[in-house]
């Protein structure tokens, strides 16, 4: 199933495609935490992806966090295929145009709502170029250094990019730190 089939769904529509479990989480929090089933596990039925949140004593807060983590998992683990001929038009996509600066750099932070859709597209392009960062950067209309900086911004994106490169027989990327 391609990511594009669910990315436009609101929370209620997405939850309708999921199985939601609540349970008692262990750990600190005292009597309230030990007596209430505040931890939430959401499993997307068709993809099998699972997201868990158990850090809050509020089931409602944990449900919101688990749903956000499920959306992140979709962007990280599900790829929308891009054919090699379609790579030339990727840099014109609306989700990239909204975050690209006049200098040609992605200006979007990890907490920005646009971050995960852009990260998903970047990983799609990286897969289409068989993990070649320079080719992916060219298709995205940014420099290789800016692409590396973007991937490094979120450890989960960095890890996924390296797993993708490994699948294509490429060496892992090294951090600039």
Regions from the language model: what does each represent?
Residues 136-137:
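The alpha-helix within a helix-turn-helix
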Residues 1-124, 128-129, 140, 166-177:
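Ribosome-associated translation termination/rescue signal centered on the conserved GGQ peptidyl-tRNA hydrolysis loop
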Residues 151:
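DNA major-groove recognition helix of helix-turn-helix
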Residues 155-159:
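C-terminal flanking helix
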Residues 132-133:
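Helix-turn-helix DNA-binding elements, focusing on the entry/boundary residues of the two helices
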Residues 147-148:
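Helix-turn-helix DNA-binding helix
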Residues 161-163:
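Short amphipathic alpha-helical segments at helix boundaries and their inter-helical linkers
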């Amino acid at each position: 199933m391609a990511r594009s089939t669910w990315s436009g769904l609101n929370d209620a529509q997405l939850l309708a495609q999921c199985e939601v479990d609540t349970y008692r989480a262990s750990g600190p929090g005292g009597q309230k935490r030990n007596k209430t089933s505040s931890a939430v596990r959401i499993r997307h039925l068709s993809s099998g992806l699972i997201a868990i949140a158990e850090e809050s004593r509020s089931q409602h807060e944990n449900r919101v966090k688990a749903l956000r983590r499920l959306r992140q998992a979709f962007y990280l683990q599900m790829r929308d295929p891009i054919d090699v001929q379609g790579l030339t038009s990727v840099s014109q996509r609306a989700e990239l145009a909204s975050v690209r600066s006049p200098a040609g750099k992605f200006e979007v932070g990890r907490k920005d709502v646009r971050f995960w859709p852009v990260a998903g597209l970047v990983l799609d392009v990286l897969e289409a170029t068989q993990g070649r960062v320079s080719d992916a950067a060219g298709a995205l209309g940014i420099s290789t250094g800016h692409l590396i900086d973007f991937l490094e911004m979120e450890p989960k994106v960095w890890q996924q990019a390296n797993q993708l490169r490994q699948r294509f027989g490429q060496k892992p990327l090294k951090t600039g730190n």
